[in-house]
Swiss-Prot record:
Membrane spanning residue stretches: none
Protein known as: Protein RecA
Subcellular localization(s) per the UniProt record: Cytoplasm
InterPro entries: AAA+_ATPase, DNA_recomb/repair_RecA, DNA_recomb/repair_RecA_CS, P-loop_NTPase, RecA-like_C, RecA-like_N, RecA_ATP-bd, RecA_C_sf
Family from the record: Belongs to the RecA family.
GO CC, any one term: cytosol
Sequence positions that bind ATP: G65, P66, E67, S68, S69, G70, K71, T72
Any one Gene Ontology BP term: DNA repair
Keyword entries, A-Z: ATP-binding, Cytoplasm, DNA damage, DNA recombination, DNA repair, DNA-binding, Nucleotide-binding, SOS response
Keyword DNA-binding in annotation: yes
One Pfam family, short name: RecA
One of the record's GO molecular function terms: ATP-dependent DNA damage sensor activity
Amino acid sequence: MDDNKKRALAAALGQIERQFGKGAVMRMGDHERQAIPAISTGSLGLDIALGIGGLPKGRIVEIYGPESSGKTTLTLSVIAEAQKNGATCAFVDAEHALDPEYAGKLGVNVDDLLVSQPDTGEQALEITDMLVRSNAVDVIIVDSVAALVPKAEIEGEMGDMHVGLQARLMSQALRKITGNIKNANCLVIFINQIRMKIGVMFGSPETTTGGNALKFYASVRLDIRRTGAVKEGDEVVGSETRVKIVKNKVSPPFRQAEFQILYGKGIYRNGEIIDLGVSQGLVEKSGAWYAYQGNKIGQGKANAAKYLAENPAIGAEIEKQIRDKLLTSGAVAAAGKAAAVEADADDMADADAGY
């Protein structure tokens, strides 16, 4: 840059700082770049697939999927993990369906959880914005976008047409709160539901509620699906769950994670540690036996996971090694390519099957 341009730029920067305050424009090289802070999801595999060890703070996240796929369970798991590190969490229950007993079983400290059950969509989003602007709340869950009913719709008759009201409400609210979320370094998670588009001949007919604004403003979008049942004998005790990262602004997207959600217990984390430990060569598997550092820890995955539950220090040690090994840029990039290929293959299979 020549001297005239340098002087002109310095004058412009000086004028901007006087008018808008120091820090209105910054040179990236003047400040040390820091990793984006993250909050664990409670699933080790999903934390690794996200690339930064969890969901990013200071960003908007959307989690969507069919009914009974584990959306609320996953968000309650995020709250439980955040509370372990002293975070303040809030749950905006627009569906009026939060079960405190179930939340407690998943590890949520219900006594410290802030809960709001608003009457209208405007009230829910205004409460969310006020909590964000307080700079005192670390995680806010909005459950769900589909239940954010505009005031005009609630006050109207049952058969009245209100075209695009909810989409306009979401668009206006997200414009307003995005900057506040970044300044407060708060994680805001919107749970969303799936609807079917009528008359779609090619491609997926599925869409999410609330218009397109949330798709643009969300830094991470997670598609969660139930893929099967977990059984003990003939009794169904949980769900096989797959999460696809449809959008990711903080790491390469299109990865996926698979884990089990056990009814009344939440994400089967010790089972994930065993599986990932074996795949990374940290846990030895010989026949049905699992061993760690030469010591047998159980016959069968269930017994090995039970051993880790009884010896949390060993489980934490294995988990730390897995995170150190996989949450490096090279390992994450390699894992991302493999998962993207696998996800593409799954999408093609789904399309062939007519899903």
